[in-house]
Amino acid sequence: ELLMNSLQFESHKKRVKITPLPFIDAIEAMKKRKIVLPDEYYDEKMDSTRALAFTVSRIAGVSQIKNVLDSLNRAIEKGDGFDTWQQNVKDDKIATTLPKHRQELVYRNAVQNAYSIGRHTHYQKHKETRPYLRYSAVNDSRTRPSHGAMHGTVLPVDDPFWATNTPPNGHACRCTVMSLSKRQAGRAGVSGKAPGAKPDAGWGYNPGTDYAGEMKAMLKEKVAGLPGRVKKSAGKLFEKYPSKN
């Protein structure tokens, strides 16, 4: 079994790089993401379903967004870093309208979310022997105060705190979570209660939670108001949605 692939940060370069060994759960997470347009993605109703959605701001076409997602899937499977992915999308003329800093943000957010989902799956599989999670912030000059306030929080894997505060907790968030055994949690000190700090606006969800049912319900509600023929065609899309585990 492949365990944990590393997601590393070079703080002085503000870069994300992933190791070449594929982390299977992260790959599967990326493949399950669904294409939505930017105005849908940033709708307030999407807060709890954003983990299963993928979009790219400033790119309006579904086919264009799909090309970006496909390229990111390949990058995660191969362990490509940002520079390699950027060169590939340039060669394939994908996302050419986006400046470099936007491309890096797209890459970083997608990779972080995929690995967060993969780690969540791993933590759930092993919570009998490692029943606690510890929040870790980088704690340098670029760490947001709200993120730093969560540093060192140690709570059970299934504590409600992790449903809204599992990293990434904002754009370019460098925070991580690590699993602990009972002995390790005892040494670190289990938190009596969750801190009052909150993630950045729009990031209050756990990327690893399966929200397929909620997303399907939301889209069905939208489809219900469409004309007959369009409604029938749109309904067929639901057959492609993954079911809950």
Predicted segments with their positions:
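Domain-core detector
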Residues: 1-170, 179-245
